[in-house]
C-alpha cells in the first residue's frame, strides 16, 4: 500500500481506557514495520448539565453534572499488509469508539 495513510480517531469517556487503547494501536503498528505519527491528544469536550433538585420551589437548589469526552488521533504512514491485518485483529476495550479513515 504505497503512499497511503490510515487515520484513526479514538473517543472515550475514560482517559485511562483511551490511553491504553492508543498504546496498543501504536505498539501493533510499530511491531509490523509502519511509521506512526501520534498519538495526538485532541481537545476534550465537556458537556455540563444543571438539574433542579426540588420538584416545586427552591430555585437555588441545583445539581451540576459533567461528561468529558476524550479524543486521540493516530496516523499510520505507509502501512504494510501485515499492519492492516494486525490492526483488524486487534481487540480494543468496549468503551472506546474507533473511527478509521484511509487517505
UniProtKB/Swiss-Prot annotation:
Secretion signal span: none
Ribosomal protein is among the record's keywords: yes
GO CC annotations on file: ribonucleoprotein complex; ribosome
Electron transport in keyword set: no
Any one GO BP annotation for this protein: translation
One Pfam family per UniProt: Ribosomal_S10
Annotated keywords: Ribonucleoprotein, Ribosomal protein
One GO MF term attached to the UniProt entry: tRNA binding
Cysteine disulfide links: none
InterPro entries: Ribosomal_uS10 (IPR001848), Ribosomal_uS10_CS (IPR018268), Ribosomal_uS10_dom (IPR027486), Ribosomal_uS10_dom_sf (IPR036838)
Domain of life: Bacteria
Family: Belongs to the universal ribosomal protein uS10 family.
Assembly and interaction partners: Part of the 30S ribosomal subunit.
Function: Involved in the binding of tRNA to the ribosomes.
Protein name: Small ribosomal subunit protein uS10
Organism annotation: Alteromonas mediterranea (strain DSM 17117 / CIP 110805 / LMG 28347 / Deep ecotype)
Lineage: Bacteria, Pseudomonadati, Pseudomonadota, Gammaproteobacteria, Alteromonadales
Protein encoded by which gene: rpsJ
Amino acid at each position: 500500500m504505497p503512499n497511503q495513510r490510515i487515520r484513526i480517531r479514538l473517543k472515550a469517556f475514560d482517559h485511562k481506557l483511551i490511553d491504553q487503547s492508543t498504546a496498543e494501536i501504536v505498539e501493533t503498528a510499530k511491531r509490523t514495520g509502519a511509521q506512526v505519527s501520534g498519538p495526538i491528544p485532541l481537545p476534550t469536550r465537556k458537556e455540563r448539565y444543571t438539574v433542579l433538585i426540588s420538584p416545586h420551589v427552591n430555585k437555588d437548589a441545583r445539581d451540576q453534572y459533567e461528561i468529558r469526552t476524550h479524543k486521540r488521533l493516530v496516523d499510520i504512514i505507509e502501512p504494510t499488509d501485515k499492519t492492516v491485518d494486525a490492526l483488524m485483529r486487534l481487540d480494543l476495550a468496549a468503551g472506546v469508539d474507533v473511527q478509521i479513515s484511509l487517505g
